């Protein structure tokens, strides 16, 4: 039975960082996006107004809290407050990218746990449910006192990766110990070997790869990470894999931030044949690497379409993965 959504009861809104993504989602759902105004005053203050009634409606509001992280976050908090004051029946905040996710614990004295603070702010603003995507650490889900769905996207990437590299001689690589769980999930799904990069981080945004744990010689390597910030981690990993005589190196990361000189570093990595393919999703709007054949953006609209349909029809979100993983295991 084909699922549908009643646009009179369920409305999707997008804020500034998720507009194109939501346009694609609404096209797939064959519904109209909700009408709203989001503006910024000369002093930087954010102004939000919803131009249609939200009373007694189930609302899904999309916003990636990506650079400028603080402005994006304030847009979302103010929008949620406006929806609550407009008597929305429920407010589901869908954050394709969750800023401050890396500040999820104290590593030194007198540090904040900012990820927990953001969770409290979203809850206090009036969100009834939060949807996160490939969150940096699973413990973030426990920071919320409201229901949280943590989505995974690897099954969407895998179709394209296998098409390019095939399964033969393919090894899944975690660029550090923190990503082992994520990489092992993919390796187990495809029944592939796993390798781990032994990495140390002497300072913020600086990574040094020391050693490879696992066999990568004459193998096609798939480096898997949740995000690319400055690119230091994956480029250092790619250099080490090349040194260990890997055949091809493909990088797959859900969130492409590409801060500082990341674009230049990756262009050099492409030219030097360090990295053969780089995949990110459109969880964050992508404006770099235009017309670069080694770079590809994977669309998450189909995933969010399925998620919204599950909410609208009171179905299990977990079933989405079970269905996709079963298909991958049978056909890949």
From Swiss-Prot:
Question: Which pathway does it take part in?
Answer: Metabolic intermediate biosynthesis; 5-phospho-alpha-D-ribose 1-diphosphate biosynthesis; 5-phospho-alpha-D-ribose 1-diphosphate from D-ribose 5-phosphate (route I): step 1/1
- Alphabetized InterPro entries for the sequence: PRib_PP_synth_CS, Pribosyltran_N, PRibTrfase_dom, PRTase-like, Rib-P_diPkinase, Rib-P_diPkinase_bac
Subcellular location as annotated: Cytoplasm
- Tell me the keywords, alphabetical order: ATP-binding, Cytoplasm, Kinase, Magnesium, Metal-binding, Nucleotide biosynthesis, Nucleotide-binding, Transferase
> In the UniProt record, does the keyword Manganese occur?
no
Where does this protein hold Mg(2+) 1? 136
Q: Which reaction does it catalyse?
A: D-ribose 5-phosphate + ATP = 5-phospho-alpha-D-ribose 1-diphosphate + AMP + H(+)
- Binding positions for D-ribose 5-phosphate? 201, 225, 229-233
Q: Name one GO biological process term.
A: ribonucleoside monophosphate biosynthetic process
Query: Might you report a single GO cellular component term?
Result: cytoplasm
SMART domains in UniProt: Pribosyltran_N (SM01400)
Knockout or disruption consequences: Probably essential, it was not disrupted in a global transposon mutagenesis study.
The enzyme's E.C. designation = 2.7.6.1
Cofactor requirement:
Mg(2+)
Q: Active site located where?
A: 199
Cofactor note as given: Binds 2 Mg(2+) ions per subunit.
Entry-linked Gene3D superfamilies: 3.40.50.2020
Which Pfam families does the UniProt entry name for this protein? Pribosyltran, Pribosyltran_N
Which PANTHER family does the annotation name? RIBOSE-PHOSPHATE DIPHOSPHOKINASE FAMILY MEMBER, RIBOSE-PHOSPHATE PYROPHOSPHOKINASE 1, CHLOROPLASTIC
Its job: Involved in the biosynthesis of the central metabolite phospho-alpha-D-ribosyl-1-pyrophosphate (PRPP) via the transfer of pyrophosphoryl group from ATP to 1-hydroxyl of ribose-5-phosphate (Rib-5-P).
Q: Which family does it belong to?
A: Belongs to the ribose-phosphate pyrophosphokinase family. Class I subfamily.
Tell me, how does this one assemble? Answer: Homohexamer.
What's the protein called, per UniProt? Ribose-phosphate pyrophosphokinase
């Amino acid at each position: 039975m084909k699922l549908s959504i009643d646009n009179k009861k369920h409305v999707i809104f997008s804020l500034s960082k998720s507009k194109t993504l939501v346009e694609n989602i609404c096209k797939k759902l064959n519904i109209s996006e909700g009408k709203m105004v989001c503006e910024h005053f000369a002093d930087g203050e954010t102004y939000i107004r919803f131009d249609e009634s939200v009373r007694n409606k189930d609302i899904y509001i999309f916003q990636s809290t990506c650079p400028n992280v603080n402005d994006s976050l304030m847009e979302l908090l103010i929008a949620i407050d406006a929806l609550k004051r407009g008597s929305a029946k429920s407010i589901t905040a869908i954050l394709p990218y969750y800023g401050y996710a890396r500040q999820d614990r104290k590593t030194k004295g007198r540090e904040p746990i900012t990820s927990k603070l953001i969770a409290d702010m979203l809850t206090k603003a009036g969100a009834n449910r939060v949807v996160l995507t490939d969150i940096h650490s699973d413990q973030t889900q426990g920071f919320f006192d409201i229901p949280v769905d943590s989505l995974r996207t690897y099954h969407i990437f895998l179709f394209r990766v296998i098409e390019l590299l095939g399964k033969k001689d393919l090894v899944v690589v975690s660029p550090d110990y923190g990503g082992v769980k994520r990489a092992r999930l993919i390796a187990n799904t495809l029944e592939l070997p796993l390798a781990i990069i032994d990495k140390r981080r002497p300072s913020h945004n600086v990574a040094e790869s020391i050693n490879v744990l696992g066999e990568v010689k004459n193998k096609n390597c798939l480096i898997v990470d949740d995000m690319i910030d400055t690119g230091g981690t994956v480029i250092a990993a790619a250099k080490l894999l090349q040194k260990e005589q890997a055949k091809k190196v493909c990088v797959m990361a859900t969130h492409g931030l590409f801060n500082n000189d990341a674009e230049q570093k990756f262009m050099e990595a492409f030219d030097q044949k360090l990295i053969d393919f780089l995949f990110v999703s459109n969880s964050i709007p992508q404006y770099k690497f235009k017309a670069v054949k080694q770079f590809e953006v994977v669309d998450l609209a189909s995933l969010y379409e399925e998620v919204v349909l599950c909410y609208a029809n009171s179905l299990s979100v977990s079933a989405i993965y079970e269905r996709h993983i079963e298909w991958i295991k049978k056909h890949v």
